């Protein structure tokens, strides 16, 4: 395992609160603190702080995000900070997933249906390969990393070591490749495939987009090279390397037979149990389905729904937690939980939802009881595997604060911008008062966010302001995700001035142009008017030098009081810091390009007749999670062009695919 130090490449040094936050977090980890919290206000550069902490500690790090989009954004940022180190992306590889389910009321069985994205699967394999081979690894993952992922020891044991000069019989090597689930295809080489041409073996590894070419002289390996899959050009010659399995789930032949025996024993016991309850139909169904699966396992080593037998295939005891991505990490690793107030509850919720569905399948004879052990980790199992953790949030949850032995605040923004000034005004005449405030902002070409409690009120308010000549739009639940992003971009670009919505808390609302946030009915207690929600909403104006928040209310609730006190406390600290250091707040300059809109633009060009030309800027703007579907689109068009003998057009598609793949795996 190599041990290259982490080295940050950034055009700026830590400023404001960042140096003290970095120093405290690093000292806390070195002192053995198991849990710490970085309580960082919006726009204070929390990702940069965490990157500096990772650099100082030099530990393999898992960064956990609560959705794919945030994971992609974090991965992009960290790759820009650490171009010399391995920054990997690990999310669910399903483009579409319908889990197996049974609805007793209508006697409806829904078979599992899924579509696996090959590009994301490659990135998952790349992450585990990096964890085996080096220590300078950062894996940015979604919550899917707490699901089972084979057995690391078996995966590593199954890897095939190759070395120049070593005596290796080619036929034996081909058998080994088949054992670790590579398939021979002498026509079309790709991920998880190999081909032989004379004394040359070419392998498409599961974990990267380069081809491995192994050249033999008799039974001796003469050369090992990485070659370009499109041009065949040699990219790198190496002395030795490991070929890792094409799938994370690797089961040796002896364990497979033992698993079949254990499955048969469990089947007999469960059939007897169902018959004792007079569930004859369920017993017959279970026996028929399981015996078919057993025959498939014995003949081909695989069956549909094989994951439901994972407990037996892995040799685990009943109730024992499955191995997951965390088990691939070497010792002395670090966990960073981003937006912990959202991510930590996700960890708690995954197990319960999974078990409710499985129980119905087991009770009605569709699955053996052991299928319940094909599951995500329970929260207590997850935290038992965690050695040291840093929670990151502007509004950390009560649990994170309770378990943290150190809470490090990061309040000062590098730009000197302070938290918004807060005003509380009565609800009587609130609409006319708000209209006057909106007019002031429109005259200064600034933007306004307004949050209401109901969709109806948002619609009525929008109509009222439109009649009075205000350029206004509103967001609601029926607007899909892409339209929502387009509306937000239009607000930033000045196509309209006021955005009204019910819940404007969702991640991604980074709007430096917004100078006023108005919260109507702020004294109506509930989720949307809770302390953390109010702080998050007020924070939407925290990126503007003239940021203000107006809370319309007739009473001062406890949530309002706490949110106002916290915002004013931060504001006082920020103002004092600026005065002491002679800092004049500078407006945040942020380009309005959006990764998802860049993806849409490319998609539209893909559907045009000519082959798209992707500029470097367009590639840079694309989000990682949006690249795999683009590659699939281009591959389909490339194959269609080749079948029509339009080889020049197919070659241009091929070149674009290569550029997208390079961007995906982090190559410049």
From Swiss-Prot:
Signal peptide, first to last residue: none
Subcellular location: Cytoplasm
Transmembrane segments: none
Matches recorded under SUPFAM superfamilies: C-terminal UvrC-binding domain of UvrB, P-loop containing nucleoside triphosphate hydrolases
Short motif (Beta-hairpin): ranges: 93-116
Residue positions binding ATP: 40-47
GO molecular function: ATP binding; ATP hydrolysis activity; DNA binding; excinuclease ABC activity
Helicase ATP-binding domain boundaries: 27-413
Residues covered by the Helicase C-terminal domain: 430-596
Gene Ontology terms describing biological process: nucleotide-excision repair; SOS response
Keywords of the record: ATP-binding, Cytoplasm, DNA damage, DNA excision, DNA repair, Excision nuclease, Nucleotide-binding, SOS response
Entry annotated with the keyword Cytoplasm: yes
A Gene Ontology cellular-component term: excinuclease repair complex
Domain spans labelled UVR: 628-663
UniProt family annotation: Belongs to the UvrB family.
HAMAP family to which the protein is assigned, alphabetical: UvrB (MF_00204)
Chain's role: The UvrABC repair system catalyzes the recognition and processing of DNA lesions. A damage recognition complex composed of 2 UvrA and 2 UvrB subunits scans DNA for abnormalities. Upon binding of the UvrA(2)B(2) complex to a putative damaged site, the DNA wraps around one UvrB monomer. DNA wrap is dependent on ATP binding by UvrB and probably causes local melting of the DNA helix, facilitating insertion of UvrB beta-hairpin between the DNA strands. Then UvrB probes one DNA strand for the presence of a lesion.
Comment field on protein domains: The beta-hairpin motif is involved in DNA binding.
Quaternary data: Forms a heterotetramer with UvrA during the search for lesions. Interacts with UvrC in an incision complex.
Protein name per Swiss-Prot or TrEMBL: UvrABC system protein B
